[in-house]
């Protein structure tokens, strides 16, 4: 029998706050909830009556919202204020947990209550993995039949990620642990370093091109993340690039051996930026960085570093090369594409135990010797250019860090979070741990042992795999050899369940008998085989439809101010619709924001239509088109109208509100580029032009590229972080809707269901963009480089390099088969 847990004395894991003495605590004893109706009831949200600040009230409200969203998603009904909509089996659970959290927050503090909820969520995740009822006293408030439902455990386990950000105590502890980890040393055996070096060399030879294309260096560096020189508020990386260009000479530069071409003449971006960064790296000391803490949802924090600009530029060059290989790696390919179904199908036929792996502070604990061995192997392969190897050396060597308290250290361990190459190096190290264990498993044991298929999928420090127990033990041992520590509560082994990228997977298996070379033992007068092994083989993998709650409870958008609720809610809900049931999303979203749909409807925006059809983007209860007749007429003109470009009317309207820097100027330049292009429905041909089926993608990429160039020359755009008001959006939408109806005045309102309309809409978007290979002046059209897998992409980049090089070096780089027909290199502008 388990010992009772005294909630007055126990401290939840991850608690951020001060624990009051036992005599002063107001937490309940096990089995009792001494709550006064006037102060701590579930119907009254603790707030001003407890003397809390606005921040404390907001964090506690988010805590309660996470529980309500989880219950709504599980039951599929909207949880109203009176809880009468919930099934009776869940009403008591909701009321009692809210009361317990209220009393605990009043007596022990809001941070203690949040930490308690996170501990409960972790217990639900562990219970779901093991298939046993979670070991937490919250479960006693559920009826026995409901308490044993694994689907409920799975949904409640997502509460932890949706909790508020970490607190002050998390920040202090994280900085101390970060400094201790990066100041420590870890000895790696020499044979392990040799194996890592050989593995990375072999990996590069298999996944990277034998002749590295130097034109990859022509892609611009973009972003607004903080650097050592400038904070994000001061413009970040974009402003630092501007400063770097303006403060550097542009003519008569000395040649650099690491560059495959050069030197450049004039302010030729981005090659000139790369050239200047390489000079600063060779002339400087250890790269410098400023350490800061980013508070993340899930009651935790992350320590990041803002590094020097030239190190980031070199790192981005190396990252682009490594990502070309990672996209070809079968263990990452489907994940990077976002094809989770293909990721799960890969395990069908694998035999053994399911392992879900997650490492603790993985990037901080990688020894520098391990990172250096991986870079040595990549360099030995000859698949990377010298400037890219220089970027890897800069990002994996010692770093001089300055902490918020003014202290400084030079790292002896760790590849920093915030450097471009960190994620790629982490993947290579993780792949070595699995492949080395797999190779060792196949070499050991009986030489006639039957082959057992094993496999894994990797994404940074996350891994899910299926394999025999001996292979998994070798994998864990390899992680220890390279200094990794498994994350407690996130590293699981199970016969039929796993977690990968916060998606819950169930593996259906069948027992299979593998017979080796037969060895018998005598039992009486019989001979009995003794070398048979029974091992489960995966026959099917199912992804649970339990929805993640983090984005629904409160969403954010990278690179911009905190978005208004009406913007973030639509983005979060629509992103879940393709993978999760509509009923669950609607129930959770309307529980959190019951009046948002009415707010849209008052301004004439249909709330439950996708944005590409002129709606707000919220997920509705059904696929019925809930819109007035005038809007349904606009949809008919949008989908079935004769104008080939009309299908993108609403899409372009919403894109106009996205936070790209210098959006107006970039869009105007794109319109100028595309003025001579022709857009038609599939079927019509233009013999003197080249057709691209996804022409709108070309336009979007063109605008984003122009935005990046403007940001590099002009610095960050202060208006790119702001959002329009909802009334401005409604006014713009009304104008687009009116223009669509005027295109086809006699059109009838659409009467089909939403699924049929979206299917027809996808067909109407299939327009061919016909472009000319040369502009009016006879020069090669640079818009062609924007299309993925375009035959002209490589050739155009070679022309860019030719335009940056001195005349005498052009012939050494360019070959006739690289250039479009009748192209004269000397005529390139």
From Swiss-Prot:
This protein's record includes keyword Nucleotidyltransferase: yes
UniProt-annotated stretches for the region Disordered: 1-39
InterPro entries, per the entry: DNA/RNA_pol_sf (IPR043502)
Catalyzed reactions per annotation: RNA(n) + a ribonucleoside 5'-triphosphate = RNA(n+1) + diphosphate
Keyword annotations from UniProtKB, A to Z: Host cytoplasm, Nucleotidyltransferase, Ribonucleoprotein, RNA-binding, RNA-directed RNA polymerase, Transferase, Viral RNA replication
Top-level taxon: Viruses
Cellular component GO terms held in the UniProt record: host cell cytoplasm; ribonucleoprotein complex
Chief location category: host cell
Enzyme category, top tier: transferase
EC number: 2.7.7.48
Signal peptide (from-to): none
Localization: Host cytoplasm
GO MF annotations in UniProt: RNA binding; RNA-directed RNA polymerase activity
Function in brief: RNA-directed RNA polymerase that replicates the viral (+) and (-) genome.
UniProt subunit comment: Forms a ribonucleoprotein complex with the 20S RNA, where a single polymerase molecule binds to a single viral RNA genome. Since the viral RNA is not encapsidated, ribonucleoprotein complex formation appears to be the strategy to survive in the host as persistent virus.
Note: Yeast strains also contain a double-stranded RNA (dsRNA) called W. The (+)-strand of W is identical to the single-stranded 20S RNA. The W dsRNA seems to be a by-product of the viral RNA replication cycle.
Name the record gives this protein: RNA-directed RNA polymerase
Organism encoding this protein: Saccharomyces 20S RNA narnavirus
């Amino acid at each position: 029998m388990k010992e009772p847990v005294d909630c007055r004395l126990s401290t939840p894991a991850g608690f951020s706050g001060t624990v009051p003495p036992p005599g002063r605590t107001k937490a309940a004893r096990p089995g009792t909830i001494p709550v006064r109706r006037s102060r701590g009831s579930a119907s009254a949200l603790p707030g001003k009556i407890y003397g809390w600040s606005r921040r404390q009230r907001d964090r506690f409200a988010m805590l309660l919202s996470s529980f309500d969203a989880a219950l709504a998603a599980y039951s599929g009904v909207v949880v109203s204020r009176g809880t009468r909509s919930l099934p009776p089996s869940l009403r008591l659970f909701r009321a009692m947990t809210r009361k317990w959290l209220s009393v605990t927050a009043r007596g022990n503090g809001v941070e203690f209550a949040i930490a308690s909820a996170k501990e409960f969520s972790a217990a639900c995740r562990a219970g779901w993995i093991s298939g046993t009822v979670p070991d937490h006293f919250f479960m006693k408030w559920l009826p026995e039949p409901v308490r044993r439902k694994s689907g409920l455990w799975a949904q409640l386990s997502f509460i932890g990620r949706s909790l508020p950000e970490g607190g002050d105590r998390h920040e202090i502890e994280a900085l101390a642990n970060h400094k201790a980890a990066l100041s420590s040393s870890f000895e790696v055996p020499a044979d392990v370093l040799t194996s890592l070096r050989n593995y990375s060399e072999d990996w590069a030879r298999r996944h990277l091109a034998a002749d590295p294309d130097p034109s990859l260096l022509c892609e611009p560096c973009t972003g607004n993340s903080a650097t050592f020189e400038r904070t994000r508020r001061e413009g970040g990386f974009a402003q630092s690039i501007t400063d770097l260009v303006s403060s550097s000479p542009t003519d008569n530069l000395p040649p650099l051996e690491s560059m495959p071409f050069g030197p450049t003449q004039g302010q030729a971006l981005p090659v000139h930026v790369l050239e200047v960064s390489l000079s600063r790296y060779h002339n400087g000391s250890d790269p410098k960085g400023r350490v800061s803490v980013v508070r993340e949802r899930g009651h935790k924090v992350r320590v990041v570093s803002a590094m020097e600009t030239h190190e980031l530029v070199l790192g981005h060059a190396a990252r682009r090369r490594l990502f070309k290989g990672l996209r070809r790696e079968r263990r990452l390919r489907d994940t990077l594409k976002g094809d989770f179904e293909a990721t799960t199908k890969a395990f069908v036929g694998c035999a053994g135990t399911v392992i879900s792996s997650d490492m603790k502070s993985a990037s901080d604990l990688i020894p520098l010797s391990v990172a250096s061995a991986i870079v040595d192997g990549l360099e030995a392969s000859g698949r990377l250019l010298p400037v890219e190897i220089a970027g890897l050396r800069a990002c994996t060597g010692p770093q001089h860090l300055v902490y918020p308290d003014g202290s400084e250290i030079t790292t002896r361990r760790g590849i920093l979070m915030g450097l471009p190459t960190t994620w790629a190096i982490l993947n290579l190290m993780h792949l070595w741990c699995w492949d080395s264990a797999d190779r060792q498993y196949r070499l050991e044991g009986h030489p006639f042992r039957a082959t057992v298929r094993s496999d894994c999928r990797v994404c940074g420090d996350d891994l899910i795999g299926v394999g025999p127990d001996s292979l998994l033990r070798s994998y864990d041992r390899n992680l220890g050899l390279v200094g990794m520590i498994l994350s407690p509560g996130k590293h699981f082994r199970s016969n039929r369940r796993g977690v990968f990228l916060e998606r819950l997977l169930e593996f259906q298996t069948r027992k299979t008998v593998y017979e080796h070379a037969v060895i018998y033992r005598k039992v009486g007068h019989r001979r009995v085989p003794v070398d048979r092994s029974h091992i489960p083989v995966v026959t099917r993998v199912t992804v649970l439809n339990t929805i993640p709650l983090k984005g629904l409870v409160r969403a954010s958008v990278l690179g911009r101010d905190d978005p208004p609720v009406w913007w973030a809610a639509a983005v979060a809900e629509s992103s879940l619709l393709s993978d999760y049931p509509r009923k669950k999303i609607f129930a959770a979203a309307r529980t959190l924001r019951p009046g948002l749909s009415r707010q849209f409807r008052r301004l004439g925006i249909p709330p439950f239509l996708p944005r590409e059809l002129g709606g707000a983007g919220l997920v509705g209860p059904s696929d019925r088109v809930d819109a007035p007749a005038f809007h349904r007429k606009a949809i008919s003109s949008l989908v079935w109208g004769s104008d080939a470009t009309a299908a993108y009317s609403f899409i372009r309207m919403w894109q106009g509100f996205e936070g790209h820097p210098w959006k107006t100027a970039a869009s105007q330049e794109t319109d100028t580029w595309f003025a001579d292009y022709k857009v038609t429905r599939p079927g019509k041909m233009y013999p003197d032009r080249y057709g691209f089926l996804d022409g709108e993608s070309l336009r979007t990429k063109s605008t984003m590229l122009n935005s990046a160039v403007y940001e590099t020359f002009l610095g960050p755009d202060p208006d790119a972080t702001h959002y329009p008001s909802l009334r401005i959006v409604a006014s713009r939408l009304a104008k687009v809707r009116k223009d669509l109806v005027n295109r086809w005045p006699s059109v009838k309102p659409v009467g089909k269901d939403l699924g049929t309309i979206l299917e027809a809409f996808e067909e109407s978007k299939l327009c061919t963009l016909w472009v000319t290979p040369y502009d009016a002046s006879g020069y090669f059209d640079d818009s062609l480089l924007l299309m993925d897998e375009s035959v002209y992409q490589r050739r155009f980049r070679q022309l860019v390099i030719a335009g940056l090089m001195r005349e005498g070096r052009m012939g050494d780089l360019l070959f006739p088969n690289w250039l479009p027909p009748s192209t004269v290199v000397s005529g390139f502008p």
